[in-house]
Amino acid sequence: MKQISFCITCMNRLKHLQETLEKNILDNFLVDEVEFVVLDYNSQDGLEEWIAQSMMKYIEMGILVYYRTTEPAYYRRSHSRNMVFRLAEGEVVCNLDADNYLGRGFAEFMLKEFNNKERLFYTSNLCYRDVFGRVCLERKEFVEARGYNEVFVGYGLEDVEFFNRLLCRGLVQEIFNQKEFYNVLMHADEERIAQEFLLKKLQSVYLDYINPYSTRVLMLYKGQRFGIGVIQNNIAMNYNHPDESDMLKQCIGDKYRLVIKGEWKEGIWDEMENGIRLNFKDEEMILRNKSNCLYDFNHQYYKVKDANLIVVIVMGVTEAINYLKMKKMDNDCKTVNPNGFGQGIVYRNFDY
């Protein structure tokens, strides 16, 4: 049995793995102790072929294991991580994003730490988004905590909620601070969410300015669904307030993030002559169309055309929705993923 497993989920991120995977293996080349587990989450960009052509020698050595699932249509962060963690054989499991470089000696450092200490989990200092998701813990602790919460959809908060749940279970958070463990591939934010449901199904985004801190967001999806709500920028509102020194507490609190003010409503929309109708459960809203705007007597929604701004809005909205879900939860692991987690069909090392 391996001592530590580095767990990588990948959906159409071939160009990142081509840069990071082999280097991470060579920088942590402990064949008897280490395994890298790649879960190909139904990629369509040639990942399977590249692994077969360029990485087979590492599979034959036993330091690399390749799994593929053909079921997902969209990338689901919590579900994919739960799958790959369950497939890992190491006593310690570590989430590793496809764009991360581990750094030379990361595996050896973690093995020493987990051999000398009990009931801990390791994270980054949580100051850098690109390394935020890296977490190492004993596999048994992951299973007992019931994994990442699969109620979260889209970008953000699945790792924060998981870390907080580990703390509530009595585990101690440790932080790796070595700068060589923080190197990443830089890339556009769109690549973080390009394979996720919300961005793929999005048809258009409209903004209704309220004040410097609040904006009403209307998102129209393909298939006639919509979402609408007020996003409040607490980061700007609390700009002059002192920061929370504990980064995890800062992430859990609403003082330093975008939040939904009130509730996020969803429903079905349909086109009308010169406008659209938003159908809620017990009401409807009619918006007229004029010069890339939708309006009624009280609101004027401007259509967002800039692709980069759309990505920023999608990331902010999904994180705010997930935060709203998290605030309604308790930290009882029994209520997390009650019907199981990380479920699905996979194929190991091309054994179809």
Predicted regions and their residues:
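C-terminal catalytic/acceptor-binding lobe
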Residues: 167-352
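Conserved donor NDP-sugar-binding/catalytic core segment of glycosyltransferases
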Residues: 108-134
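Short beta-strand/loop segment that forms part of the nucleotide-sugar
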Residues: 32-45, 67-70
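Short, well-formed alpha-helical segments that are part of the catalytic scaffolds
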Residues: 13-28
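A conserved acidic beta->alpha catalytic loop
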Residues: 38-51, 97-101
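Short aromatic/hydrophobic "clamp" motif used to bind/position activated sugar donors
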Residues: 93
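Glycine-rich, basic loop-to-helix element that forms the pyrophosphate-binding segment
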Residues: 71-88
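Acidic donor-binding/catalytic loop of UDP-sugar-dependent glycosyltransferases
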Residues: 46, 100-113
